[in-house]
Curated annotation (Swiss-Prot):
Tetramer of two alpha and two beta subunits. Its EC number is 6.1.1.20. HAMAP family: Phe_tRNA_synth_beta2. GO terms for molecular function: ATP binding; magnesium ion binding; phenylalanine-tRNA ligase activity; RNA binding. Mg(2+) binds at residues 321, 327, 330-331. The gene is pheT. This is Phenylalanine--tRNA ligase beta subunit. Signal peptide: none annotated. Belongs to the phenylalanyl-tRNA synthetase beta subunit family. Type 2 subfamily.
């Protein structure tokens, strides 16, 4: 939870309701209100609802619940003459900027909003840092984000004399806290005017030149960081909340100096999330319709359309909490009100039993053992160089490069096993069943889990027929009369491989391993391999039950 302190009278004035009503509506948004004194309240907000970290963001959400405003908020957006040139900044390579004109906002609240974003999406400024400047005091319409030497001088925020960046790191609290994040090789990231004057050294401190005051209504906002997505989301969150305070958003041209590519910032990107009516009914246990679902989505300040019977929700980028379908369902529950969802007693007379997939996998393992194969078990993680497809899940910051990817097939693991057991008595017959993660563009993540089984034989002399016979036996024992269609790929010898089909559905692959692949794995003997797609087999067998 993230805690913010707001003036309750200013907040209530934005939405024209009483305090008890405010508390009830915030409870629906998974937030709690605690009074501090006569004028101020403390609000605990879920850490994923970054758009609610200011009074204007809260007001926007509550206006939707009150049906004073429905759907995504519309803001005044205009082009400006301002340009941000992004140079090659090695420690924090991404930057975007925007202008906001005539926003009527409490300065203390704006600073609180900025720091709460630093602590959440910004990961204490390590991932994202925000600079907010008084536009009146920015002299140049061309701003550059670049590396500067530590000898650069400027007056830091609330300072009264020029200091070098080195001195700022040594003498200021911000320098001591955040200097180690971005300083490297004797240079610092900096936001600089075209005359060379420094406006800020993110993520450390702004220049005193563009300090905000009570009369500031026009803002220049820069966001820098290590993740482009987080930078774009953060900027959208800030400018949309300032626009709720009456501001007009000004676009800034962003030029990447290395390749001259141009963006118009803020990006205001949206995501389309499809929602199934039956899924909503199942999760919430309610009777509803597509139209009613769309109404609740609109109350949660997102746009919703029904196209060809499909509910399409348009998610604004500042709603960083909406990752997939279940998050939209949660928003629908908030719109309905948790207190309005009727609890029902769940009565079950079912007895525990094995999942069908577990039983099928057990059967396949028993058949493999019965066919004379020894079961092995490899890690789900693997070295990416061993994979045959470039569509796989890469591990960020792996503990070791030997396990830097998630396997998308069982075949590389079997080949790796064979390469390490060439000294064993021949023939070697092994198999494995287990999970892989395969590419699937139809899913939210672009990948899905798949259950598979793979079989391998290595001997002084071995051919396609040696593996085809036991595989056919296993599939026939499962009740599948399959056929084999010649199909070449980079794993097997051309003309000595096939795909396994049942009623035009691919159930697996089989073939003699290509000598180039054997050399790649350091295998000196011929090998044959088959891989069965258990998930697909399960679908077919389930349909036959």
């Amino acid at each position: 939870m993230v805690t913010i302190v707001l003036n309750k009278y200013k907040l209530l004035d934005k939405i024209h309701i009483g305090q008890q009503k405010l508390e009830d509506l915030l409870f629906n948004l998974k937030s709690e209100v605690k009074p501090i004194d006569e004028n101020n309240i403390e609000i605990e907000i879920n850490a994923d609802r970054l758009d609610l970290l200011s009074s204007d963001g809260i007001a926007r959400a509550i206006k939707g619940l009150l049906e004073k405003e429905l759907g995504e908020a519309k803001y005044n957006v205009t082009d400006t003459e301002y340009t941000l040139i992004v140079d090659n900044v090695r420690t924090r390579p991404y930057a975007l900027a925007a202008i906001v004109y005539n926003a009527k906002i409490d300065l203390e609240e704006l600073i609180q909003f900025q720091e709460k974003l630093h602590g959440t999406i910004g990961r204490k400024r390590k991932k994202v840092a925000i600079g907010i400047h008084d536009l009146r005091k920015v002299d140049s319409k061309t701003i550059e984000y670049k590396e500067v030497p530590l000898s650069y001088k400027f007056v830091p925020l609330y300072g009264n004399k020029e200091l070098t960046i080195s001195e700022i790191l040594e003498k200021t609290e911000q320098g001591k806290l955040y200097g180690n994040i971005s300083i490297a090789n004797g240079v610092s990231p900096a936001i600089v005017q075209d005359d060379g004057e420094v406006l800020s050294i993110p993520p450390i401190i702004n220049s005193n030149k563009t300090r905000l005051d009570e009369n500031t209504k026009d803002f220049f906002i820069d966001v820098t960081g290590t993740s482009f997505e987080a930078v774009a989301q953060t900027l959208d969150i800030i400018v949309s909340n300032l626009a709720e305070a009456g501001g007009t958003i000004g676009r800034v041209k962003v030029l990447k100096s290395a390749n001259s590519s141009q963006l118009s910032s803020p990006l205001f990107l949206h995501k389309i999330q499809n929602v199934r009516e039956e899924y909503v009914k199942k999760i919430l246990g309610i009777k509803t319709s597509k139209e009613e679902i769309c109404k609740h989505v609109m109350r949660m300040r997102m746009n919703c359309d029904i196209e060809n019977g499909v509910i399409r929700v348009t998610v604004p980028q500042y709603r960083v909490d909406i990752l997939n379908e279940i998050d939209v369902v949660e928003d629908i529950a908030m719109s309905i009100g948790y207190n309005n969802l009727e609890p029902s007693k769940y009565i079950s007379t079912n007895y525990g039993s094995y999942d069908y997939m577990t039983l099928l996998e057990r059967k396949i393992r028993e058949l493999g053992i019965g066919a004379g194969y020894v079961e092995i078990s490899n890690f789900v993680l693997i070295k990416d160089e061993k994979l045959f497809s470039n569509k796989y899940v890469k591990i960020l910051n792996p503990v070791t490069e030997e396990y830097n990817a998630v396997r998308n097939s069982l075949i590389p693991g079997l080949l790796d096993f064979l390469s390490k057991n060439q000294h064993a008595k021949f023939p070697i017959r092994v198999f494995e069943t287990g999970d892989v993660v395969v590419y699937d563009s139809s899913t939210d993540t672009g990948f899905r889990n798949d259950k598979r089984a793979a079989y391998a034989i290595m001997d002084n002399k071995v051919s396609y027929e040696d593996i085809q016979a036991p595989i056919h036996y296993i599939l026939k024992s499962l009740g599948l009369e399959v056929n084999y269609k010649e199909e070449n790929n980079n794993i097997f010898i051309e003309g000595r491989s096939a795909s396994i089909f049942y009623e035009n559905e691919k159930m697996g692959v089989i073939g003699e391993v290509n000598p180039d692949v054997l050399i790649r794995f350091g295998i000196e003997y011929p090998a044959v391999i088959a891989e069965l797609y258990i998930s697909e087999i399960a679908k077919r067998l389930t349909n036959q039950r």
